[in-house]
Amino acid sequence: MTGSLSTQQVRHFEQHGYLCPLAGIPAAEAGDYAARLADYEERLGVEPQKYFKIKAHIAAPWMVELGRHSALVDAVESLIGPDILLFGASLFSKKAHDSRFVSWHQDSAYYGLDPHEEVTVWVALTESRRENGCLRVIPGSHRGPDLKHDETYDPENLLAR
């Protein structure tokens, strides 16, 4: 595999700490993964984030397949080189008009890695817009230290324990 990002995209990532939009997996494949997630939810009987917030790829092998998708791995390789490890995978099932949310956080605070050379790839399996709760970022926040994260215990917060 070779990195697929342009020099300009890599520079943007290094400066701002995020990169979007990025052509990810084709819509038909996203639909297949969304169907696998729905099947997984049905078999579990609960939403997967209840049990699999960080290591979902261990219980759901199709998550490993998704994590190895060449479109994603090629982009990551452009940012950190070819030595890539899938360290964690999270599943958040949030339907349209769902009042729940994911609170502001830094992914790096959950992994305890030092130095911070990890990359998070956020993959939406369905359409994601501001109106239905898309990912939001604070540009440049990757340059500072991990901030203190307060547990809210809010039942509407998908990150709550």
For the regions a language model picked out, list residue spans one by one.
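Non-heme Fe(II)-dependent double-stranded beta-helix
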Residues: 1-113, 150
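Conserved hydrophobic/aromatic beta-strand scaffold that supports enzyme active sites
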Residues: 2, 18-20, 120-124, 134
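Short loop segments at secondary-structure junctions
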Residues: 23-25, 125-129, 140-142
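Short, conserved beta-strand element in jelly-roll/cupin
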Residues: 79, 105, 112-130
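Alpha-helix initiation and capping sites
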Residues: 27, 66, 115, 119, ...
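Double-stranded beta-helix
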Residues: 130-161
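Conserved beta-strand segments that form the floor/walls of ligand-binding pockets within enzyme
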Residues: 86, 103, 120, 124, ...
